[in-house]
Structures are given as C-alpha cells and as structure tokens.
Amino acid sequence: MGQATRTTKLPLDLSQRTQGGANSDKRAFLEATVQVLNAARAFYVDFFLAHAEKLSERVSYYSQQHLEMRERAISANELLTWAECHTVETTAHPHPWPSWNFSERFPDMPFVYRRSAIKDAIGKVRAYLSHRRTWEQTGKRKGKPGLPGASNHPSLYQGTIELSVGEADQHERFVCLKVYTGACWRWVNYPVHSSRYFERRHSEAGWEQQSPRLVLRKKSAELHFAQTKEIQAKKVKESKADPHLVTVAVDLNVKNLAVITVRQDGKIIETVFVTDRGLDHHRYRHLKRLAKKQWLSGKPIKGEHSNQQLWGHVRRMNEDAAHKAARSIANVCAKYPGSVLLFERLRRIRAKGASKSRRMNRRQANQLRGKITQHAKDKAFAQGVVTVEVNPHGTSQYCSRCGAKGERFSLLRGKRITARWGKLFWCPVCHYEANADYNASANVHHSFYHEWHWQPRKKATPQAVPSG
C-alpha cells in the first residue's frame, strides 16, 4: 500500500490584451503577490530559526492503540497555532512579541496566505535543522548546510482561488485569484489555457485534490494542481512466489531509449522498442554549437549562465522524450495487472574521452536514463505496478538463451566488426544472434530470478580463531 502523486499544469493566458490575454497590471499583481509572500515566509523562517528549540519539543498524548501515555514530536498544526499566538495581533492575544509583530509588518494579509507561509517556513526550518544535525554527527568541516531560503512557489489554499473552466465547448475560461495589488488584497480574474486533457485529469475519479501552487516565471505563469491516490500493491516477495508472475524488464540505451520485454512462465511473450527518433543526433548538434559559443566567449563569468535559451530547449527535449518513453513503459505494464517492473541498478556512468560536445551529449543521455526510470516508476505505481532494480552485471555480455559469455559486433560495409559498442550480440556456444539491447533486456529477467551467474553472493562465515 502506498500513495501515488501526479501534477497537472494549467497555464495562465498572459498574452496581449487584444489577443484575449491578461493585461499588464494583472501580471504585475502576480509579481507583487509572490514578492509579499516571500517576505512573509522570510519573516517566519527567521522566527523559527530564532526559536529552534520549539521545533524539537516533545508533547505527551494518550495513545488509543496502546492505552497509555506516550510522547511524540510537536506537529506542524501545533507549531502554527503557537506561532500565530505570539506573532499575530487578535482579540484573544492582543499583544504579540514586540520584535515579531507580523500584523504590524503585513497588515490586512489574508489569514489563509499567512498560514500557507507559516507551513512552508516550518518545513524549510525543520529540513535545515535535520541536515545540520546530520552534518554535526559526521564531524566534517566541509559540507555545512546553508540557512534556508525564503523563496518558494506560493500554495493557494481554499479561500484564495476559484476555478471555473466551464464546459468543453466554451472558449471563456477563467480562474479567480486573491492577489496583492501593492496597496490591498482583492479578487482578480485571469484567463487560462484550459483543455480536455486538464479537465479529464482534474475530474478523474479516485484522485484526491491538493492545494495548487502558483508557478510564476519570466514570461509565463502556471497553476500546478497536485493529486494523490492510495494504491494497493503486493510486496515483491509475495509476487515472486506466484509461478505465473509477469515481469516487465526495461533496458535503457542511447538510440533505443527503452527495450521492453515481457516474460511469463520462462518465455518472452512481448517485446517493444522505443527509439529516440533522432533525439541523440539532434541534441549533439545543439551541444556542439554550445561548446563552440562557450569557446568563443572565453572564460565564463562566475554567477552568469550563458546560452540559456538553447540549454532550456535541450532540457525540454529530454524531459519530453523521458515522459513519452515512460508512458510507453507504463502502457505495457497496464496490459498485465499485478506485474513487476524491472530496471537495471545503474548509478554513476561517467563520459570519458572524445570531444567536449560528445562528452556533454553522453552526460545528457545518462541523465535521460535516470529521468525515464523515475517517470516510469511513478506512472507504473499509479497503476499498482511495483518497480524493482536488479543487478546489472553482465546483462550485455552474457547470452540470454544459454548463459554463456558472448561478444558484441556490428556490420560495417558487410564486414563483421567486434566491438564493445556493437549493435548485435553473438554467442559462441549456442550460436545465438540477436539485437544487443534485446539480449540485455532479456537478461534483466534472469537477474531478477537469480538465474545462471546472477546468483546471490553468500556471506563469508567468520572462521574460529584457535585459542592459545
């Protein structure tokens, strides 16, 4: 049992007013709102850092399960009540602490936004104190965590947003936000770019709505709607006991982004190739241009980022390819309910040799593998499919039919060339030839079941030391 999370984006229309977008004043309202909420968040970050002992306080409570008094860490809601009691001026507590008077610094701020800032500050300070405690236990001088920052995308709790997307055939769709104009807080309508995709995801049964976040960028603004869903899934040990278990193995590569094989009862019953559709070469040309421009511009200035538009284009290409490959993997898993998704346990893969642009391209390809793995895990878990990472040793070197060590080769102008990067695999024992990526994907199943040379290592038993 677990919880799956997904996010659906709803872009705000900030185009020209003549084109149906929001006017420039409404854009300024969003910037002012984010700015004042960052200042409020900074106020409470400083407040909790000054009273850090309160965050580690233990409170007593009566446990209905154990029928006795127990202790637990103070909750975020209790910290919120305590912070409001000492910083906000109300009839119940008209005299807040003089140096921490929030009502004086931020008059007329809606209490919903104030509580959103307090909750964010609690999470930031608790994470900082936890990291600092871990660093102090290591005894190292380097790596000291820095103080938490106050910038964050504001959470829009109930009472600060009203969404009205209308029917699918309507063109006028708006979202009403409570924003800060620089002088007061008021409700403002913003046109949005709604779609059938958003409406279907937003109203899909079984998903619980969370508070959306306002993500404001230089030239765009979006509302990110998070949704959660409780998932019932078997443990891997329980699934492995099933003799008819279906396993879905994925081998990640450069040209073939993912080679998916499905195995049941010891036989491969389905194979799917997900290619990059020219992504690797297209990305290499961009990175070659980037390397040349960086060389022409000379030594980079510290703190400045060059070629931001081109780098953003490369990142968006990788993200799009990762989501599409992960969706293909999740679609295969959806055909076999109760299956287990298998990936190789790949960690550090360093690009060596070649030119700077090729090393950069290999690094981007390696990062793309990690993105595909993470997105596929999330999408598959939303369907009740559990993911397992297996030992990757020898998956590309051993035969998936007999288990003998083979070799990789390629055909260049009709000649057979043996190379580590060969696209084909050949076994000298059983004379089996196949696509090298397919062979590696089939071996991932053998690694999961600990077949052939993928046996679990036996722990060395300590030998008794003779006495005397």
Predicted regions and their residues:
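Positively charged, helix-rich recognition surfaces that bind polyanionic ligands
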Residues: 4-6, 221-468
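Acidic carboxylate diad motif detector
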Residues: 70-217, 272, 362, 366
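Generic detection of short hydrophobic beta-strand segments and adjacent strand-loop junctions
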Residues: 4-21, 184-196, 272-276, 403
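Short glycine-/small-residue-rich flexible loop motifs, especially phosphate/cofactor-binding loops
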Residues: 31, 92, 125, 330, ...
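Broad gene-expression machinery/nucleic-acid interaction feature
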Residues: 7-9, 158-160, 172-176, 220-222, ...
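Residues in well-ordered beta-strands of folded domains
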Residues: 11, 164, 178, 213-215, ...
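A generic secondary-structure signal for well-formed alpha-helical elements
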Residues: 41, 48, 125, 129-132, ...
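Long, compositionally biased intrinsically disordered regions
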Residues: 1-120, 133, 295-304, 310, ...
